[in-house]
Amino acid sequence: NHSLATAKAHWESIKPTLSEAERKTHPARWCLAEVCNLHSPAIQMEAIHRVVFGAPAASLLLAAVEFCDQEGIEITNQRPQYEYHVLTARKQIKVGLRHCKSPLAVGVLEAMLGEYLAGHKEATVDYIHGESEVRRLAAEGNIGILLPEFQKDGLFPGVVQGGVLPKKTFSIGHAEEKRCYFECRRIRP
């Protein structure tokens, strides 16, 4: 979990500044964790969308077509395995893919974006919670990519079939519910 990794990195960064006695009692030594049943209707999982900055849409779409060709992925809107919405300031394009090796839609997208970013150092990607925020950023001249809804029942089969989940696969809860990340850290830096 990225939050756990962030908490550990924070602890590792302050640990050298503490005495042995302070290390044993400092609150940053521990993390806040919640154990819950994923099957509970109270747990809502949402896809985390992508926004690409600093890339011309034509360049990214051409790279996506080349990536799909290399991977044997068919681009089609006829009974697609996965469906994405690509947003620019002027257009919204529905892109369907079939014959994907990844058991999760986000896996295909992450592989393609990773390859693109490696060859285009001027471009960056950010991980965005919420469709409205993706649309707002795309309207400003960036490229928004809306992932399909993340289905809870796809989580464990996705891990079994694909191994480690791709970066920022899903979020539990809505963006505005994530305030605790900041508030808990503020208790004591």
PLM region descriptions:
Residues 1-189:
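Surface-exposed, charge/polar-rich loops and edge strands
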